[in-house]
Regions:
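Short acidic loop-to-helix transition motifs that present clustered carboxylates
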Residues: 82-87, 139-143, 166, 325-328
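Small-residue (G/A/S/T)-rich helix-start motifs and N-terminal tracts that mark the onset
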Residues: 1-69, 76-79, 157, 168-323, ...
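Internal gly/pro-rich beta-alpha loop/helix module
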Residues: 98-100, 105-196
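N-terminal small/polar loop signature for handling phosphorylated ligands or for N-terminal nucleophile
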Residues: 50-51, 58-61, 65-126, 262-274
């Protein structure tokens, strides 16, 4: 299940509740150490040298507990008591060219600026440019705010214990946290902490989407309509359509502008492709409609934009709006408040829609989601970027845990919009639209992660082929 994003005080309360039930700190530390070692083995090869930096507190204990489980690895454990004295030891080990570092210097309890000796020690670790696994939080980072205390370890991956700490999701923390993963089965009591921000786990989708009924037919799984593609941007329509196919709605009809009709139709066999006319009546037979991918040409008329605005306001159909079409929406309530609405802005688009700057959006992404949803008909908002958010004006907001920087390539967003739309078009999946959207976002990122594990130079076409198959 999704995990609440919590603050440091809540984590301490959770730990105290666990100790009160009879669980021991030593047992939790032992389990954490075992999981740290498992991750470190996965990220290294046999006979690699792993450097472990262990501080005085429980964070250091977690790191030390990993040592006995690092089979077939050479380990250099440095117990760091004084950074000034131990810096020379660090420099000597770094000359041995370790392949990997485990950072257990400071935990979430750090609440003071680091002195110059600690800053120099951490700077030396960072200057080595080695992959670092941070235990619970990168040393030097404020787990409450995401700011650093003068310096912080730049981790490739952070394994946080129990639940993500709110500061780790702040934009300021991203360069230090790296990829954030949660160690959620380490002997702590079940978490009863309430938080509006939830961390998505793969287990959320263990039995989702549900199995198809044995007598299901094309009509059972809906008819997706797509309005996409214009001169110079026809590839976006193709990618969105192919991604929608991976979601397996019963039928897909794509309407596009006449100058790109042949270029698009020649690439799509199972999608019905039509030329755009002056109204949207063609979509009346659809069970959902995607609007926007590749509609960026200068010859998109004001008449078209106005028709889309009215469609957004008045249609009872589920609508997914992406890319250039987001700029055409008016901040307005819909006349059918029960209708499913989804918008998928990246930070730049969100900033334009909210009439604010991109840094302002990124500084408080949760607030941006709430405000976007409120302004645009209580729509579901997929605020893309690192740790994509999914939510509405009220209720929980979910942080996506999958994905990697290689998603930052042209066509990635078109693929996501198409996959979301292909799922939302299916009537059996519309009852829990939020979960359906979250699944699409997670699957999109998980597919990228699986591709990256196999091949570092994959392209969006590879991503489309993987959608629905990531585990």
């Amino acid at each position: 299940m999704s995990i609440p994003v919590i603050n440091v005080g809540q984590m301490r309360d959770w730990e105290r509740a666990t100790w009160a039930k009879g669980q021991t700190e030593d047992e939790v530390i032992r389990r954490v150490g075992k999981k740290i070692a498992r991750h470190a083995r996965r990220l290294t090869r046999a006979d690699d040298l792993i450097l472990i930096l262990a501080g005085k507190g429980h964070n250091g204990d977690d790191a030390r507990a990993a040592v006995e489980h690092l089979d077939n690895r050479r380990v250099e454990l440095l117990d760091i008591n004084s950074p000034e004295v131990d810096l020379q030891r660090l420099e000597l080990v770094l000359r041995l060219k370790p392949a990997f570092v485990i950072d257990g210097l400071f935990g979430i309890g750090l609440n003071r600026p680091l002195d110059e000796n600690w800053k120099k020690f951490i700077a030396t670790v960072n200057a080595a440019k080695l992959p670092v696994l941070a235990v619970d939080v990168p040393s030097g980072l404020n787990a409450e705010t995401g700011e650093h205390f003068g310096a912080a370890i730049e981790a490739a991956v952070t394994l946080t214990v129990g639940a993500p700490k709110v500061g780790m999701l702040a934009q300021a923390a991203w360069p230090f946290v790296g990829r954030l993963e949660v160690l959620d089965d380490v002997g702590l009591e079940p978490c009863h902490i309430q938080s509006e921000l939830k961390w998505t786990q793969p287990e959320d989708f263990q039995s989702y989407p549900p199995q198809r009924p044995v007598a299901g037919h094309k009509g059972t799984f809906g008819h997706l309509g797509i309005l996409a593609g214009s001169l110079g941007y026809h590839g976006a329509a193709v990618l969105a359509s192919r991604a929608a196919q991976r979601a397996q709605p019963g039928l897909i009809s794509l309407t596009t502008h006449e100058p790109v009709f042949h270029a698009i139709a020649s690439q799509l066999q199972a999608v019905m492709v039509h030329v755009w006319t002056s109204d949207l009546k063609r979509f009346d037979a659809s069970s959902a409609v995607l609007i926007g991918p590749g509609l960026a040409a200068l010859d998109i008329t004001e008449q078209t934009k106005g028709a889309i605005r009215r469609f957004w306001r008045d249609s009872e159909l589920p609508l997914i709006v992406d890319a250039s079409a987001l700029d055409w929406l008016a901040a307005q309530k819909t006349t059918v408040p029960q209708a499913i609405r989804v918008i998928t802005p990246h930070p730049g688009e969100a900033a334009r829609m909210l009439n604010m700057t991109v840094p302002a959006v990124q500084a408080d992404r949760l607030r941006a989601v709430r405000e976007l949803s409120s302004r645009f008909g209580n729509s579901w908002v997929v605020l893309k970027g690192h740790q994509t958010l999914v939510g509405r004006s009220t209720g929980d907001i979910f942080v996506n845990s999958s994905g990697n920087p290689h998603l930052a390539q042209g066509g990635s967003g078109d693929a996501l919009a198409g996959f979301i739309a292909g799922l939302v078009a299916q009537p059996p999946l519309q009852a829990d639209a939020g979960r359906t959207i979250r699944y699409a976002v997670w699957q999109h990122g998980a597919a990228a992660d699986e591709l990256q594990a196999k091949c570092s130079n994959w392209v969006v076409e590879d991503l489309v082929d993987m959608l629905g198959n990531a585990r």
